[in-house]
Design a protein with these regions (language model features):
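Glycine/proline-centered hinge or cleavage motifs at structural transition points of membrane proteins
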Residues: 171-172, 185
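Juxtamembrane helix-boundary/capping and inter-helix hinge elements in multi-pass membrane proteins
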Residues: 78-82, 158-163, 173-176, 227-231
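Membrane-water interface segments at the C-terminal ends of transmembrane alpha-helices
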Residues: 2-33, 44-158, 186-206, 234-253, ...
């Protein structure tokens, strides 16, 4: 018994050390003497990094919270055409990495992409730079990461107390009022958990922000290390990123408090039946999100793949597939 206890403690300690060691390393960078490069970053780039990162987090956070919660409520609480298969289809964007979705939308909606070409030639709409501003990158992150909030909110809605929902219905509350005043407050802990994961993913992303030429802490860390060859400044910037991550975790725990994610009441709620036009409007909304976040990008990837494979297929693609498969398998085994 003691031997098993010590073995389990050893592996837990090893895991904790593996997580804590990189944090300790980047934190210890502040003990090093200051450099002119850090002063340059702090005076010229740091305010821009903080502003752009904050705008990105606020935009993505608000977007995934609203979209993920609304989608979860619709598939759980409302009966509409296509509900049964759309409920699981909304998880499929998990299978497309964020940078891949960004690459697809840049290829389609960039100035030379066929979407802008069609808009200019047939509708006379002038060209625009999809990389300018914040809206395009925020929408990309929302389409990629909304499943985190959707997954958590959906599970919460399925386990909410039937008595409270039914009481609201009996008192004559309309579905939208039940949603805002009963269902959403009860699901707040789950929504906060999904939001936390989303913000952490957004904060750590490098591929999407690089494709959009958007300045965040991750691009600054890479620039400090790769362009300026300064590991010290890169570590100091990374420590600020870790500090923001700790703040997000603390904020999520405070927002959740001691609230429960689910109720022990497992009675099934009776879904609202959306009749006629309303049901089809809901269907096209949910289906549209599925198309934008998964089906259309996947179709575009397949089209590009077939074009490439038909002209330059070679054995190196088998190496790419095998390497990806091995890494996926090993990561899955180690994680589980």
């Amino acid at each position: 018994m003691k031997e098993a206890f010590f073995k389990s403690n050893f592996w837990i300690g090893l895991l904790a050390f593996s997580v804590a060691f990189p944090i300790f390393v980047v934190g210890s960078s502040w003990l090093l003497p200051g450099s002119e490069l850090w002063l340059h970053f702090a005076q010229t780039l740091l305010p821009e990094l903080i502003t752009s990162t904050l705008i990105l987090l606020l935009g993505v956070g608000a977007g995934v919270s609203i979209l993920g919660t609304v989608l979860a409520y619709l598939v759980v609480m409302v009966e509409f055409p296509g509900r049964s298969w759309l409920e699981w289809a909304l998880f499929l964007p998990f299978g497309i990495p964020a940078y891949v979705l960004a690459f697809v939308y840049l290829g389609v909606f960039d100035y030379s992409g066929y979407a802008q070409v069609w808009l200019r030639e047939y509708l006379g709409i002038p060209g625009f730079d999809i990389r300018s501003g914040h809206w395009a990158i925020i929408l990309t992150f929302i389409l990629v990461f909304y499943p985190y909030v959707y997954m958590m909110a959906r599970a919460s809605f399925k386990r909410q107390k039937v008595q409270m929902i039914e009481a609201g219905k009996m008192l004559g509350a309309k579905p939208i009022r039940v949603f805002w005043q009963i269902s959403v407050p009860l699901a707040r802990p789950a929504i906060a958990a999904g939001l936390l994961v989303t913000l952490m993913e957004t904060l750590a992303d490098f591929g999407v922000v690089s494709l959009f030429n958007y300045s965040t802490f991750t691009t600054a860390i890479y620039s400090a290390w790769g362009d300026f060859r300064s590991i010290e400044v890169a570590a100091q910037l990374a420590s600020l990123l870790v500090l923001v991550s700790f703040f997000l975790i603390y904020f999520e725990r405070k927002a959740r408090g001691k609230a429960k994610y689910y109720s022990s009441d497992v009675s099934h709620l009776k879904a609202y039946y959306a009749k006629g036009v309303v049901g089809w409007i809901i269907f096209f909304f949910v289906f549209g999100i599925f198309m934008l976040s998964f089906a259309m990008p996947l179709l575009q990837i397949l089209i590009w793949s077939l074009e490439v494979f038909s002209t330059e297929w070679s054995k190196r693609y088998f190496n790419y597939f095998s390497s990806s498969g091995i890494l996926t398998f090993l990561a899955t085994v180690l994680t589980v």
